[in-house]
From Swiss-Prot:
Record family assignment: Belongs to the anion exchanger (TC 2.A.31.3) family.
UniProt KW Transmembrane keyword: yes
Name the record gives this protein: Probable boron transporter 7
Membrane topology: Multi-pass membrane protein
Alphabetized InterPro entries for the sequence: HCO3_transpt-like_TM_dom, HCO3_transpt_euk
Localization annotation: Membrane
Natural source organism: Arabidopsis thaliana
GO cellular component, one term: membrane
Secreted in keyword set: no
Length: 673
């Protein structure tokens, strides 16, 4: 991203860059045919489930002024706008936890002011959105995205940890609430007698922990040693939804003599009911908000604008990691401008705004990377085999494969194709020529193309558009959503919290504090973050304690009744602290590793034992044909490999060998550092 200096320069550059590939963004999806439906369904489920959970949380915190239907409507509307008019179509938008937190504080403030109250809550929130939209557009016009490089790992991981703790907090509050009488209900009803409340609470514990355990297990289904590959892949992609359906079905197996309302289920009005239709006309009440509160709305708008700017840019960064090898240009400035427009529309319609979300955005890119590689690999293998039947030379085979690659390269900037295929060319040309590692080996299209084909992503807009439409159609499925027990959602909140921890180096360093010196070698034996081998233990401890203290400050701010709306402020301050203060407290080289922009992982021990696979010397000793190995269900495939090298937030790991050859000496130094 170029550092544009003049106003509107970033937006203009982004718009012109994306305009050149806009037509191809649509054609690329149509060329994929029905295969585009697989990543569409995958990202639809990954996007819809959190929105349903957040919608239920929003409903409880705002006395049902907003809820699941409004959250789904916002996600669908903003998703459609962004997929059609946005700059980066791989970026997924939706209602996220920061929006829920801010709208909760707005509701608390509105209820405490008689001039506003519950009646004008959405109208005042609309004014907050108007100011937020103005600020976001100004940030885009003034090229504020040029500072995106200052969003380092420490801020992102602290924010992620805060959201994780708030998820767990919400799950605990929800479970405790299952034993209590809801605030808006009549406590004299039979369903709220002690024995039935206790029964409902125990069932809630079973359902929530049941979903948590099974969802976490299904999350890593691709690495299971049981089942066929297609089955493992299906469970890995859609396991969370399957578990939600499974535990919702289990909730109907309770004895029939339980009163209605045990277990408790989602309560949401039909989209055509009068209380739902009110949101579309909230703009009429905005004129009733006193002028003083219209001006006061600017204060929370500053916090929300900064929060959206940070979250949206980081989500876009994660969706466009350089390892994905994207060819179309970025559009940070333009997308922030579009975000401002979407926030304005949502505010006027009485909906909670949507912004870029993690991990859905990098998950979307990852699913399209697998699809594109499968398509390229299939066509290139077919062309290579066709040439081999014609007894073409190796140079002719490579030339034909390169033509296929160029033909499928949809980007207008396909000038580096030859350079990207250098490794494949070398492998093809050296085969049968007695050179390098391929000495004495015949060129095998299946093996060589798989090993040397560069990563490609099917950059298009259709999957984002279709998943947004599907999210919108969920609003019509209210009768089905009402069948979900609320306790299952508390389990899903806990699942989102636990699943977000792996790959968070702040969490990894916290665990390191509780490992005794004599057992630290266990960390080095497995896969571990690079800082473990590079940074002295004392520096790791000091940096972690600073981060822990700052996290407690951020979390403490969220407990301030009305002032909690300022919770994004510490994260803005942290950017300055990182740039000017931490540089003096820590060795710059150590700080660069601890706060690096990329996740680097060291290989401490072999991950797989080839003695259980049909490969290498074992295959040759038993005279097993190569075709048997290639068609074996036990081989690793693209999606499984991407799962292994991706953190839970969608961040690609840089995996390298240990920087120390003498392991025993390294352990000794590490234990005494």
């Amino acid at each position: 991203m170029e550092g544009v200096k003049f106003p509107f320069g970033g937006i203009i550059n982004d718009f012109n860059g994306r305009r050149k590939c806009y037509k191809q963004d649509w054609l690329a999806a149509f060329n994929s045919g029905v295969r585009i439906l697989a990543p569409t369904l995958y990202i639809f489920i990954a996007s819809a489930l959190p929105v349903i959970a957040f919608g239920e949380q929003l409903s409880r915190e705002t006395d049902r002024s907003l809820g699941i239907a409004e959250s789904l409507a916002s996600t669908a509307l903003c998703g459609i706008i962004h997929s059609v008019f946005g700059g980066q179509p791989l970026l997924i938008v939706g209602v996220a936890e920061p929006t829920i937190i801010m709208y909760t504080y707005l509701h608390s403030f509105s209820k405490s002011r008689p001039e506003l109250g519950q009646k004008l809550y959405l109208a005042w929130a609309g004014w907050v959105c108007v100011w937020t939209a103005v600020l976001l557009m100004l940030l885009a016009m003034l090229n504020a995205c040029n500072i995106i490089s200052r969003f380092t790992r420490i801020a992102g991981e602290l924010f992620g940890m805060l959201i994780t703790v708030l998820f767990i907090q919400e799950a605990v509050k929800g479970l405790i609430g299952e034993f209590l009488v809801p605030k808006s209900d009549d406590p004299s009803l039979e369903v709220y007698q002690f024995q039935w409340r206790y029964t409902n609470g125990l069932l809630a514990v079973i359902f929530s922990f049941g979903l948590l355990y099974t969802a976490l297990k299904s999350r890593r289904a691709r690495s299971w040693k049981y089942g066929f590959r297609w089955m493992r892949g299906f469970i890995g992609d859609y396991g969370t939804l399957l578990m939600l359906v499974l535990w919702s079905a289990f909730s109907y197996t309770v004895p029939r003599n339980l009163p209605e309302g045990v277990p408790r289920r989602l309560e949401l009005p039909l989209p055509w009911a009068s209380e739902s239709l009110y949101h579309w006309t909230v703009v009429k009440d905005m004129a009733k908000v006193p002028p003083l509160y219209i001006l006061a709305a600017f204060i929370p708008a500053i916090m929300i604008a900064g929060l959206y700017f940070f979250d949206h840019c980081v989500s876009a960064q994660m969706a466009q990691q350089k390892e994905f090898n994207l060819k179309n240009p970025t559009a940070y400035h333009y997308d922030i401008f579009i975000l401002g427009i979407m926030t304005l529309i949502c505010g006027l319609l009485g909906l909670p705004p949507s912004n870029g979300v993690i991990p859905q955005s990098p998950m979307h890119t990852k699913s399209l990377a697998v699809l594109k590689k499968q398509q390229m690999r299939k066509k290139m293998v077919q062309k290579a085999k066709e040439c081999m039947r014609e007894k073409a030379s190796n140079s002719e085979i490579y030339g034909r494969m390169q033509d296929v690659f160029i033909e499928m390269e949809t980007s207008p900037k396909a000038t580096s194709v030859v350079k990207e295929l250098e490794n494949l060319k070398e492998a093809v040309m050296k085969a049968d020529d007695g050179g390098g590692e391929t000495k004495g080996k015949k060129f095998d299209p299946e093996v060589h193309i798989e090993d040397h084909l560069p990563v490609r992503v099917n950059e298009q807009r259709v999957s984002n558009l279709l998943q947004s439409v599907l999210v919108g159609l969920l609003i019509l499925a209210v009768p089905v959503l009402r069948m979900i027990p609320t306790s299952v959602l508390w389990g899903y909140f806990t699942y989102m919290a636990v699943d977000s921890l792996p790959g968070n180096q702040f969490w990894e360093r916290l665990q390191l504090l509780f490992i005794t010196p004599g057992r630290r070698f266990k960390v080095l034996e497995g896969l571990h973050a690079s800082f473990v081998e590079i940074v002295p233990y004392k520096s790791i401890v000091m940096f972690t304690l600073f981060q822990l203290l700052y996290f407690l400050i951020c979390y403490g701010v969220t407990w301030i009744p009305v002032g909690g709306i300022l919770f994004p402020l510490p994260f803005f301050i942290l950017i300055a602290l990182r740039q000017y203060i931490l540089q003096r407290l820590f060795d710059p080289s150590h700080l660069q590793v601890l706060d690096s922009s990329e996740y680097e992982e060291m290989v401490g021990a072999p991950q797989r034992n080839s003695s259980f696979g049909f490969n290498g010397e074992l295959r040759e000793a038993h005279n097993i044909p190569l075709s048997v190995v290639e068609n074996s269900e036990d081989e690793f495939y693209d999606a499984e490999i991407l799962d292994e090298i991706t953190t839970s937030r969608g961040e690609l790991k840089h995996r390298t060998l240990s920087v120390k050859e003498d392991r025993s000496q390294m352990v000794k130094i590490y234990n005494h550092s």
